[in-house]
C-alpha cells in the first residue's frame, strides 16, 4: 500500500511548531545530523529573491531571517497549521499560501512563476513510494528560466549511534521516510531536472543548489 504524504506532515501541530526551532534547528541539527542551522540559513542569504516560493515551510525560521529581502513570498505545504503559523511569522509581508501535495503535478498557474525556490528538510519527511523525484520535477516547472532553487534533506548516513537510533524511531513513526535516501539518489534527481546544480554533504545532510530547469 502506498503511504500518504499526510503521514509525514501530521506531526506538525501548533504545539510542535512552537518547539520546532529549539528541537529541530538547534538540538537535532547540532548534535544528531551535524549540520548547523547557520549553514542552512546561508543558503537563503545567498540565494533568496524578492519573488520567492518556500516548499515545506516548517516554522518559517529561515524566511524570518531574510524577510528584508522579500517583496512577496509564496508558501506551499500540505499542512494548514504550518501555512497559518508561517504566514503569521511573516505578517508584515505580502504572503500567499497554497495547500499542495508536492508529490502530485502542480497546476499550470505556478509554471515559471518564481525567481527563487527553497525546499528545506522536506524530502526526508515524504513517503517513499518511489516518486520523490516528482518534487524536483515540480520545482523545475515552477522556477523561472533564470531563477535559482535550493534546499537540503537528511539522508540515511549517520555518524553516531544516537543519530541512528533517533532516525530509526522517526522512520518507524512515519515522521521520516528516508531509508532509501542517499547522496546518489538526490544527485540523480538534480541531474534529471536541472542543467546546472551543486550538491554537497554536511554531516547527515545533503545541501543542493540548482538552476537552468529542464522542462
Task: Annotate each PLM feature.
Residues 146-154:
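Conserved beta-strand signature within the Rossmann-like core of class I S-adenosyl-L-methionine
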Residues 66, 138-140:
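Class I S-adenosylmethionine-dependent transferase superfamily signal
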Residues 126-138:
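A short, conserved alpha-helix within the catalytic core of class I
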Residues 161-184:
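Conserved Class I S-adenosyl-L-methionine
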Residues 193-215:
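Core SAM-dependent methyltransferase catalytic element
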Residues 53-106:
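Class I SAM-dependent methyltransferase SAM/SAH-binding core
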Residues 1-47, 167:
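Conserved class I S-adenosyl-L-methionine
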Amino acid at each position: 500500500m502506498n503511504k500518504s504524504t499526510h503521514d509525514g506532515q501530521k506531526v506538525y501541530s501548533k504545539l510542535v511548531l512552537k518547539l520546532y526551532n529549539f528541537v529541530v534547528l538547534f538540538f537535532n541539527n547540532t548534535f544528531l545530523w551535524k549540520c548547523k542551522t547557520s549553514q542552512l540559513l546561508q543558503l537563503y542569504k545567498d540565494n533568496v529573491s524578492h519573488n520567492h516560493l518556500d516548499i515545506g515551510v516548517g516554522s518559517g525560521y529561515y524566511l524570518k531571517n531574510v524577510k528584508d529581502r522579500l517583496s512577496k513570498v509564496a508558501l506551499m505545504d500540505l499542512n494548514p497549521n504550518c501555512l497559518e503559523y508561517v504566514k503569521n511569522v511573516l505578517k508584515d509581508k505580502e504572503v500567499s499560501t497554497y495547500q499542495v501535495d508536492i508529490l502530485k503535478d502542480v497546476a499550470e498557474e505556478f509554471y515559471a512563476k518564481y525567481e527563487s525556490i527553497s525546499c528545506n528538510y522536506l524530502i526526508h519527511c515524504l513517503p517513499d513510494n518511489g516518486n520523490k523525484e516528482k518534487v524536483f520535477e515540480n520545482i523545475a516547472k515552477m522556477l523561472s528560466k533564470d531563477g535559482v532553487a535550493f534546499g537540503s534533506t537528511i539522508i540515511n548516513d549517520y555518524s553516531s549511534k544516537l543519530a541512528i537510533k533517533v532516525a530509526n524511531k522517526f522512520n518507524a513513526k512515519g515522521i521520516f521516510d528516508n531509508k532509501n535516501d542517499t547522496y546518489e539518489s538526490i544527485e540523480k534527481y538534480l541531474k534529471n531536472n536541472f542543467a546546472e546544480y551543486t550538491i554537497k554533504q554536511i554531516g547527515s545532510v545533503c545541501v543542493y543548489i540548482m538552476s537552468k530547469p529542464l522542462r
